[in-house]
């Protein structure tokens, strides 16, 4: 039996606040809040006559009052918990008196040869502030290279004319030619560098010569022959595939623990029902499998969904597998035992509902597997392009064809071939194209190159067409079959004696009972 919940009662202060305005408070509430009970009055009147201050009564400090605890037959009391007295050494105070008197010298007359600037500072005054600290820093600058500045040179004397050397306003510019090469392992190019003016080093060709001279020190000995091994190109590289292939990017221990706990919750057959879903709506709109509803583009289906249903209303779900589902969790991607990618949702059914409103149901694991992703073989990278040199020279006059035509003169045979009048002939008429385009049997393509094209085939008709006239035969045809079948006639049983006889010709609509159905009078036998 469930115990009733205990309701918290209102305090005396809350009752006093609510009933004081309407003057409906009980007397005990007023006495307790306003401290007008008998005990309060005794304390008020007794405290006016008797003073117990300093004794520490009902304070809970445990100090024994102002005099402390005094044992019987002993000296004065001792305070409990008092702070110890700190003994400080005595310091001789300094005598504060007037400052020393400085005598004032008599006024000395100013010498006529003395300077007119008089210093206002008195060197005999007492400086109360601390003395200034003089800081001396020696700076030794480094050697500075002389900078050559082109300035005009002026040479001459008193009796010679001035000669000015004027600098060139447009000095020659100094050009620096450099070359930078970046190595890209995904792109290999075979180039022949054409040296330009001003470049003295090329990094593509290195010449090594042996036996070109030198001086030999010591005796003659056989040189050691070292077999050279072919070195790989600097542009080639290999990617090692892990064995076995990795399935996760960051295999952390924490992620494995979460995956194991989730797997126990989904695949526990004793506590969770396993239901495989075949409808593809389970990926995008799983709520449509639970109940009929309209599409809401704002609603996100990738969350936990709760379906509420009244007891009196019962709706058949679109899919019988989602019957009585009241909660459907968010999607979870896992891996099945066969290696497929599985989309799982953990739901709960509301099969039983108690009188208090509690729903009881089992947990259901809805899942659907995706197709496998096969491992493709790696593709070998090919060279993007090769050329024989850095620069391409195109000579227009050599590769183009020039035709010199005099438009003022009519070529021979043109008027004959084109059947033109020599009086109205114009040289621009030769540029006209008289070709006739024939689009019969062609195909019309509608669309842009970036989008999918739609092909429309235009049929080709022959002209003129002979009309086709269809005549319908009115007489028809008679088809005789070689075999005949007899269908049995069904005879429905009819009663011999009618129950009710209705006269149709009679306008009254009355009926007569058959004489055989009338009650027969029983004749009694008299003894």
UniProtKB/Swiss-Prot annotation:
Source taxon at top rank: Viruses
GO molecular function, one term: DNA binding
One Pfam family it belongs to: Late_protein_L2
Record has DNA-binding as a keyword: yes
Segment forming the signal sequence: none
Localization terms from the record: Virion; Host nucleus; Host early endosome; Host Golgi apparatus
UniProt keyword list: Capsid protein, Cytoplasmic inwards viral transport, Disulfide bond, DNA-binding, Host endosome, Host Golgi apparatus, Host nucleus, Host-virus interaction, Late protein, Microtubular inwards viral transport, Phosphoprotein, Viral penetration into host nucleus, Virion, Virus entry into host cell
GO cellular component assignments: host cell; host cell endosome; host cell Golgi apparatus; host cell nucleus; viral capsid
One GO-annotated biological process of the protein: microtubule-dependent intracellular transport of viral material towards nucleus
Disulphide-bridged cysteine pairs: 19-25
Free-text description of this protein's post-translational modifications in UniProt: Highly phosphorylated.
Subcellular location, principal: virion
Span(s) of short sequence motif Nuclear localization signal: 1-10, 519-526
Known role: Minor protein of the capsid that localizes along the inner surface of the virion, within the central cavities beneath the L1 pentamers. Plays a role in capsid stabilization through interaction with the major capsid protein L1. Once the virion enters the host cell, L2 escorts the genomic DNA into the nucleus by promoting escape from the endosomal compartments and traffic through the host Golgi network.
Subunit comment: Interacts with major capsid protein L1. Interacts with E2; this interaction inhibits E2 transcriptional activity but not the DNA replication function E2. Interacts with host GADD45GIP1. Interacts with host HSPA8; this interaction is required for L2 nuclear translocation. Interacts with host importins KPNB2 and KPNB3. Forms a complex with importin alpha2-beta1 heterodimers via interaction with the importin alpha2 adapter. Interacts with host DYNLT1; this interaction is essential for virus intracellular transport during entry.
Sequence similarity: Belongs to the papillomaviridae L2 protein family.
Protein's UniProt name: Minor capsid protein L2
Gene giving rise to this polypeptide: L2
């Amino acid at each position: 039996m469930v115990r009733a919940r205990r309701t918290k009662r209102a305090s005396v202060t809350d009752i006093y606040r609510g009933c004081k305005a309407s003057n409906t408070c009980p007397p005990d509430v007023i006495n307790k809040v306003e401290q007008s009970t008998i005990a309060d009055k005794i304390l008020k009147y007794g405290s006016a006559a008797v003073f117990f201050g300093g004794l520490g009564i009902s304070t809970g400090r445990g100090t024994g009052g102002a005099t402390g605890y005094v044992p019987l037959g002993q000296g004065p009391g001792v305070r409990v918990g008092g702070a110890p007295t700190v003994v400080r050494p005595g310091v001789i105070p300094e005598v504060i008196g007037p400052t020393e008197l400085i005598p004032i010298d008599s006024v000395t007359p100013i010498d006529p040869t003395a300077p007119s600037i008089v210093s206002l500072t008195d060197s005999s005054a007492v400086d109360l502030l601390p003395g200034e600290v003089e800081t001396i820093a020696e700076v030794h600058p480094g050697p500075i290279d002389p900078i050559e500045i082109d300035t005009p040179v002026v040479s001459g004397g008193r009796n010679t004319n001035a000669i000015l050397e004027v600098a060139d306003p447009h000095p020659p510019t100094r050009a620096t030619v450099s070359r930078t090469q970046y190595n890209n392992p995904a792109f290999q190019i075979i180039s022949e560098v054409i040296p330009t003016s001003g470049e003295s080093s090329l990094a593509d060709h290195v010449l090594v010569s042996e036996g070109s001279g030198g001086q030999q020190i010591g005796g003659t000995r056989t040189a050691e022959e070292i077999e050279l091994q072919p070195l790989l190109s600097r542009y080639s590289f290999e990617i090692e595939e892990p064995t076995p292939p990795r399935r996760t990017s960051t295999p952390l221990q924490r992620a494995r623990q979460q995956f194991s706990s989730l797997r126990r919750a989904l695949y526990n057959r004793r506590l969770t029902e396993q239901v495989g879903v075949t409808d593809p709506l389970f990926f995008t709109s799983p709520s449509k499998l639970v109940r009929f509803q309209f599409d809401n583009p704002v609603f996100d289906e990738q969350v936990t969904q709760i379906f509420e249903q009244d007891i009196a209303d019962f709706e058949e779900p679109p899919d019988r597998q989602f019957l009585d589902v009241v909660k459907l969790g968010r999607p979870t991607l896992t891996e099945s035992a066969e290696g497929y990618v599985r989309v799982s949702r953990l739901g709960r059914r509301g099969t039983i509902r108690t009188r208090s409103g509690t729903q009881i149901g089992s947990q259901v694991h809805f899942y659907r597997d995706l197709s496998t992703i096969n491992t493709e073989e790696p593709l070998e990278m090919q060279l993007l392009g090769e050329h024989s040199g850095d620069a391409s020279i195109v000579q227009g006059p050599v590769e183009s064809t020039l035709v010199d035509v005099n438009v003022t003169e009519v070529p021979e045979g043109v008027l004959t071939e084109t059947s033109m009048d020599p009086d109205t002939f114009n040289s621009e008429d030769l540029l006209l194209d008289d070709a006739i385009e024939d689009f019969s049997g062609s195909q019309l393509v509608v669309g842009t190159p970036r989008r999918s094209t739609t092909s429309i085939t235009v049929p080709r008709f022959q002209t003129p067409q002979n009309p086709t006239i269809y005549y319908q035969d009115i007489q028809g045809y008679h088809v005789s079959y070689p075999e005949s079948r007899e269908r049995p006639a069904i005879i429905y049983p009819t009663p011999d004696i009618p129950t009710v006889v209705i006269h149709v010709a009679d306008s009254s609509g009355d009926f007569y009972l058959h004489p055989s159905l009338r009650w027969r009078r029983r004749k009694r036998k008299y003894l």
